[in-house]
Amino acid sequence: MSAVLDKGSLVDVFSSPSVVFNQIREGYCAEFIVEPLRVGFGLTIGNAMRRVLLSSLSGFAISAVGIKGLTHEFSCIPGVREDFADLALNLKKVVLKSISGATCGNLHLSVTDGGAVFSNMISPSHDFEVVNGDLLICNVAEGVSLEMEMKVSSGFGYVSSVSVRKDEYDLEGAVPIDAIYNPVRAVNFTVKPTSAGSFAGHDKLILYVETNGAMDPKTAVLEASKILSTQARCFLNIADPEHRVHGVPCGVSTSDRNDASDLLSARIDRLYLSARARKCLNGENIVYIRDLVSRTEADLLKAPNFGRRSLEEVKKELFSKGLSLGMNLDSHG
């Protein structure tokens, strides 16, 4: 689409749109109405937000389970109606959120007299809260006891159990299960013509977001927006290439640079990493995020017990913060 602009009208054409938040179900569903947008920008922004919301937000999930007598995923569980495959499917649906800032930990479930076992029967934890307490986990025969230990880890998207090595978790005798970390369940959007005053004919973006309750839609959209903004900000360095720091969103203001410097000076505890990855990094004397981003992929893969899965975990977490491995930090002192 082309347009002839009068002098001084360029800024008006790309005026900042407004956002209206409509809550559909508190903590779970909401829609965001964005207008006015230049024609074509509704589709551009809608696609970008949808991709980030469905792929780049971190969350928590049960990634391994240990039951007395269980040695592999094909073992029978005495006194339990469900086989391990069905049990794993149910545990995959348990929604967790961190209440202490912890990025990993263990949960315990104990049943002494049989009956239906629900997720709200998981022992209370100082680190994690079960959001959907009404989820049926399994059915135990009368008079049969069941002891279950579950490993909780943080991550992105969906991780299959076959990609997890047994030495990547610290729960003895546990069997890994598929894990769904992303707190966003569904994202849809539509683009319509806006009727907002003088902007009639521009785009109106209606973004629908549904989460699992571990993160509310407003927070999810905010986090996704930060990720997109951080990644796009790298192009601002084109105007001042001599002061570019590889991978660091220098931005255009002193406050932006200070924010980046503060993040680099933070300890790696601020990152959502598994216990295994964190232990490997500590073994390499990597204490601060600055130490981590100055290493290359090859450097990390040389560390004992640090494999490709741990590497991808680190890269995704750094990406969500606008950082990357192999950064040149000379200009940060």
From Swiss-Prot:
One BP annotation, GO: DNA-templated transcription
Region (Alpha C-terminal domain (alpha-CTD)) location: 259-333
Pfam families xref list: RNA_pol_A_bac, RNA_pol_A_CTD, RNA_pol_L
GO molecular function: DNA binding; DNA-directed RNA polymerase activity; protein dimerization activity
Enzymatic class: transferase
UniProt cross-references to InterPro entries, sorted A to Z: DNA-dir_RNA_pol_insert, DNA-dir_RNA_pol_RpoA/D/Rpb3, DNA-dir_RpoA, RBP11-like, RNAP_asu_C, RNApol_insert_sf
EC nos: 2.7.7.6
CDD domains with a match to the protein in the record: RNAP_alpha_NTD
Gene Ontology cellular component annotations, sorted alphabetically: cytoplasm; DNA-directed RNA polymerase complex
Reactions catalysed, as given in the entry: RNA(n) + a ribonucleoside 5'-triphosphate = RNA(n+1) + diphosphate
Region described as Alpha N-terminal domain (alpha-NTD): 1-239
Alphabetized UniProt keyword annotations: DNA-directed RNA polymerase, Nucleotidyltransferase, Transcription, Transferase
Domain of life where this protein originates: Bacteria
HAMAP family: RNApol_bact_RpoA (MF_00059)
Function: DNA-dependent RNA polymerase catalyzes the transcription of DNA into RNA using the four ribonucleoside triphosphates as substrates.
Family: Belongs to the RNA polymerase alpha chain family.
Record text on subunit structure and interactions: Homodimer. The RNAP catalytic core consists of 2 alpha, 1 beta, 1 beta' and 1 omega subunit. When a sigma factor is associated with the core the holoenzyme is formed, which can initiate transcription.
Name this protein carries in UniProt: DNA-directed RNA polymerase subunit alpha
